[in-house]
Amino acid sequence: MRLLENLWGKKPSRKSDKKKKGSSNYAYAVTRVRAMKSKLLPKESYPRLLNMGIDEITRFIQESEYKNDVDELAMKYSGGDLAEHALNRNLALTYDKLVRITSGELNYLIVAYLKRYDIWNIKTLLRGKIYNASVEDILESLIAAGEFTYTSMSELAAKATYQEIVEALKHTEYYPLLQKFDGTNLAYIENELDKIYYADLFEAIGKPRSKDRKLFAQVVRLEVDVKNLINLFRLKKAGVMQPDEIMPLMIEGGLELKIEKLAALPYDEFVNELQRTQYWEAISGVVGPDMISLTTLESRLTRYYLESSTILSHVSPITVVPILDYIIHKNNEATNLRIIFRGKETGLSDELIKDQLVII
């Protein structure tokens, strides 16, 4: 644990000033980020990776942007564990770099967006404790890309119980909600944490008047729609049909979906209503009464979201959106690699692994 703390080093300050609108360095930051995006793995890499074993895949990423992460962690980990830690470390350091190279309002928006990783980490810590995961297993899934440092999260992971973790977070905005966690209501807590995150993010965006903030808001609202739509499918397929059971699980602020109307519809009518939305073309080929797994549906919607963020990043190139687009695609790359490593490690067929990937 101490080794990782030393390797990851100190996080840059996440304090930013939204009032410093004149000091934003959009042109410089976007130029840097476009260069970073050009180094993401090309889509042609994934068929090759699917034909490799774990050691070969590790060597492959060791020759890419993940080289330093793999090299520095190889003394402590191997196989899928090495990959997991290296991917998470790389994400954290990459996003910290974005915080360092941005300033003013641009920095403020990026910091607000990256707080999603604090939510991820709180969920991971709570889930780990109630399922009696080892400290190492918990650390493997933490991503120090938000405001929480890796050192502070390591200390939380070492706590004996979830109650101790909750108490250690008493000075955060999440504490009033976390006090309601009793060890049996994790799904409720996780959903409410997501709501807090998006409410805070929309507050940071404010009432979007500039083209920059309007585009930023559009990407976030599109993501909310995708999350709600996946959740609606999951609930409908599970036989949950009552709006009063569905609505508390929805996130406010979506772009197009009329959630209250969709929540009240039986499955067939729900699907028919979706044909009027922008999302239908992306999912029409996999939606049907006999649909059992939602994996392909989720992949299609995620792909649509990624493609849309890229399109919006070209609408106004010198804005926050190209940086947001890079964050989204970088996370998707890490997710794809994680799926491949874990799939290979557990013996899944290449076809099953491929179904879970979102390749752009």
UniProtKB/Swiss-Prot annotation:
Record-linked InterPro entries: ATPase_csu/dsu_sf, ATPase_V0-cplx_csu, ATPase_V0-cplx_csu/dsu, V-ATPase_V0D/AC39_subunit, V-type_ATPase_csu/dsu, V-type_ATPase_csu/dsu_dom_3
UniProt KW keywords: ATP synthesis, Cell membrane, Hydrogen ion transport, Ion transport, Membrane, Transport
Domain of life of the native organism: Archaea
Location (main, coarse): membrane
GO cellular component: plasma membrane; proton-transporting V-type ATPase, V0 domain
Localization per record: Cell membrane
GO molecular function terms noted in the UniProt entry: ATP binding; proton-transporting ATP synthase activity, rotational mechanism; proton-transporting ATPase activity, rotational mechanism
BP GO annotations: proton motive force-driven plasma membrane ATP synthesis
pH curve summary: Optimum pH is 5.2 for ATP hydrolysis.
Membrane topology annotation: Peripheral membrane protein
Family matches, as Pfam families: vATP-synt_AC39
UniProt-listed PANTHER family: V-TYPE ATP SYNTHASE SUBUNIT C
Oligomer and partners: Has multiple subunits, A(3), B(3), C, D, E, F, G, I and K(x); there may be a few other subunits as well.
Misc note: This organism has both a Na(+)-translocating F1F0 ATP synthase and this H(+)-translocating A1A0 ATP synthase.
Function description: Component of the A-type ATP synthase that produces ATP from ADP in the presence of a proton gradient across the membrane.
Family: Belongs to the V-ATPase V0D/AC39 subunit family.
Name of the protein in question: A-type ATP synthase subunit C
Organism listed in the record: Methanosarcina mazei (strain ATCC BAA-159 / DSM 3647 / Goe1 / Go1 / JCM 11833 / OCM 88) (Methanosarcina frisia)
